[in-house]
């Protein structure tokens, strides 16, 4: 069976792929796209869309609007560009050999992105905008669970791996930060602002520095 291309109407559509390499495009409206098996390209286009990659090496492109992207099994790529809103990724894949990635569009470098940890979620915010990506449960089990993403890629060739991301989200800003440790001996420094530091497991050193800070040692 050959690869299929399906395009939606201007309304709220539900499109389903087959066990081949499908291309599904949502067009206007708040659409639901399900690639099923195969190496699929899912494009939400405009609207608040829901994209399910299914099994296979899928590319999920939310487009404009606040979209939900579910990659599932396979080496999946989530693409994001300026002005595309606030997307949420749930990347549940138990394959230990997978390489799942976020790819930012032209003109976006690593210096344009602010990385934060919100509980177990990874939040990537495009500076000077309201655009952001939330990767649900990324830090579950210290970023070793099924929900992790292996790479964050930029068009200039720079790639952030898991270890780099784990380090970056522990760096304080001049504002009010929430910093989290891992199940190792962490050193967290709040810097300026009214900060909250969470050591979690391990023999940690928590330094509030300036501001009215709250420090939680953990186990």
PLM region spans:
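Short intrinsically disordered, low-complexity coil segments enriched in acidic
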Residues: 1-9, 217-219
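Low-complexity acidic/polar repeat-biased segments
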Residues: 1-5, 123-169
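Disulfide-bonded cysteine-rich modules in secreted/extracellular proteins
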Residues: 6-15, 160-181
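Acidic, glycine-rich calcium-binding repeat modules characteristic of RTX/beta-roll
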Residues: 12-16, 20-118, 130-146, 176, ...
């Amino acid at each position: 069976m050959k690869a299929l291309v399906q395009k939606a109407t201007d309304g709220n559509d539900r499109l389903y792929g087959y066990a081949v390499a499908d291309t599904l495009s949502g067009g206007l409206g708040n659409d639901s796209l399900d690639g099923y098996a195969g190496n699929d390209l899912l494009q939400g286009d405009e609207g608040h869309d829901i994209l399910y990659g299914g099994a296979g090496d899928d590319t999920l492109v939310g487009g404009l609007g606040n979209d939900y992207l579910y990659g599932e099994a396979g080496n999946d790529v989530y693409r994001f560009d300026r002005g595309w809103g606030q997307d949420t990724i749930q990347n549940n894949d138990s394959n230990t050999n997978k390489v799942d990635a976020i790819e930012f569009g032209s003109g976006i470098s690593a210096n344009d992105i602010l990385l934060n940890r919100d509980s177990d979620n990874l939040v990537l915010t495009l500076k000077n905008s309201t655009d952001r990506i939330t990767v649900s449960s990324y830090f579950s089990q210290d970023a070793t669970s099924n929900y992790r993403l292996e790479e964050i890629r930029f068009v200039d060739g720079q790639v952030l791996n898991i270890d780099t991301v784990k380090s970056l989200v522990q760096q304080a800003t001049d504002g009010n930060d929430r910093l989290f440790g891992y199940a190792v001996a962490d050193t967290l420094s709040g810097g300026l602002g009214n900060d909250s530091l969470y050591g979690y497991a391990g023999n940690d050193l928590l330094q509030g520095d300036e501001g009215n800070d709250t420090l939680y040692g953990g186990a």
